[in-house]
């Protein structure tokens, strides 16, 4: 099993798809990495040679991925919260950050509905 950037890459997948298991690598970036490393994107991960894996690791090292990227994102959000910006407050309150409506919808960000207290007379 190939291990790149601390992640076990699924051996049955094509190189391009397997690289997307790494946080911060999508299809486009995976394809560019494979092309730069001279690896066919349709080649299965289990069929990659050690030299090819090493070239992929080398080209992947240029990008911020996995733990470093997660840390960078968390620090950006923390900075927004510390500055007291509108976006920071939305993050803090667990509401949508990019201007979406919240009167209805926004359930992903807000979580499951809470039952409203009924006022009986």
Curated annotation (Swiss-Prot):
UniProt-listed InterPro entries: Rbsml_uS13_C, Ribosomal_uS13, Ribosomal_uS13-like_H2TH, Ribosomal_uS13_bac-type, Ribosomal_uS13_CS
Source superkingdom: Bacteria
Keyword rRNA-binding attached: yes
Gene Ontology BP annotations: translation
Disulfide bonds: none
CC per GO annotation: cytosol; small ribosomal subunit
Keywords: Ribonucleoprotein, Ribosomal protein, RNA-binding, rRNA-binding, tRNA-binding
SUPFAM superfamilies referenced in this protein's UniProt entry, alphabetically: S13-like H2TH domain
A Pfam entry, by short name: Ribosomal_S13
Spans annotated as Disordered: 91-121
GO molecular function, one term: rRNA binding
Function text: Located at the top of the head of the 30S subunit, it contacts several helices of the 16S rRNA. In the 70S ribosome it contacts the 23S rRNA (bridge B1a) and protein L5 of the 50S subunit (bridge B1b), connecting the 2 subunits; these bridges are implicated in subunit movement. Contacts the tRNAs in the A and P-sites.
Subunit structure: Part of the 30S ribosomal subunit. Forms a loose heterodimer with protein S19. Forms two bridges to the 50S subunit in the 70S ribosome.
Family: Belongs to the universal ribosomal protein uS13 family.
Name assigned to this protein: Small ribosomal subunit protein uS13
Source species: Bordetella avium (strain 197N)
Taxonomic lineage of the native organism: Bacteria, Pseudomonadati, Pseudomonadota, Betaproteobacteria, Burkholderiales
Chain's gene name: rpsM
